[in-house]
Each structure stands twice: as structure tokens, then as C-alpha cells.
Amino acid sequence: MKIQSLGHVVIKVRNIEKSIEFYNGLLGLPVVAHNEKPPMAFFSLGNHHDFAVMEVGDGAASPTVKQVGLAHVAFKIGDDLDDLRDAKSHLDNASVPCAPVDHEVTKSLYFADPDGNQVELYVDASDAWREEPQRVAQSGPLAI
């Protein structure tokens, strides 16, 4: 067996409509399908679906840093720091606090969705990882 690629990610949310508004309305992910039981929305970036949200109800606990499970979902938004600046401005205008991070091979913004799930928007910044794979583990502050 050989895994060929990552197919999609599904995250659990409290309210499907709030999540659709966030991922489609704010971030611009195109909705391609819905499911009623369990309530789900599927988003596509060119495949049948790349990302989905599944409603688990208002009583669900928020994710925490010390909890086993998904740490964050990352979406590439371009190859230029100006793309990241535009994204930061967009998030700032929507009153979504974000943390800029320099990973050397990428420049990133980290923030939370309405349920506390962590999201990363990033731009590629360097191909250094091709020669030195360990470079993907770099992390520091980013001033943008």
C-alpha cells in the first residue's frame, strides 16, 4: 500500500450555518454539497471535496491545546507576502484576531473558527526544504 495524497479533512462544529458563514462567507471556500444526517457541508478547491464540517451540536466542548486530535487546518492562499497582507487585512476587517508566524518555508496567519478550531492561511516563501527537509520545522514571529 502507498498513500498517494491527502484527500480531505472533516472537522466537527457546533453550528453548521455559522461554520458555512465562516468558511464560505469569510474565507471564500466554495460549498459543493450538503448532508442532512449528520448535518454536514462539503467545500471544494478543485477536487470532489477537500474540506468538510460536521455539526455535533451546541453542547460540544471546545478543542484545547492539551487535547489529542487535530491541531489546525492549513489553506494555501498564494506565493507572495502581499497575499498574506491582504488576508490579514480581510481578517482584521472582520474582527478575527490572527497571529502572523514565520516558518521560513511559509509565512502564515493563525486564527480560530467560531468553534475554536485552529486555521492557518499561508503563502509559500522558500524551497529550502527541498534540500534540507528539517527547515519545515522553523517557527518565529512575523511582522506584516
Name these PLM-found stretches.
Residues 58-64:
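Short beta-strand/turn micro-motifs at beta-sheet edges
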Residues 6-8, 68-72:
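Short, solvent-exposed beta-strand edge segments and adjacent coil->beta transition regions
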Residues 39-41, 48, 122-144:
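Amphipathic alpha-helical "stalk" segments
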Residues 12-56:
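Core segments of cupin and vicinal oxygen chelate
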Residues 13-17, 73-118, 123-129, 142-144:
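Vicinal oxygen chelate
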Residues 1-3, 65-68:
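Short, flexible turn/loop "capping" segments at secondary-structure junctions
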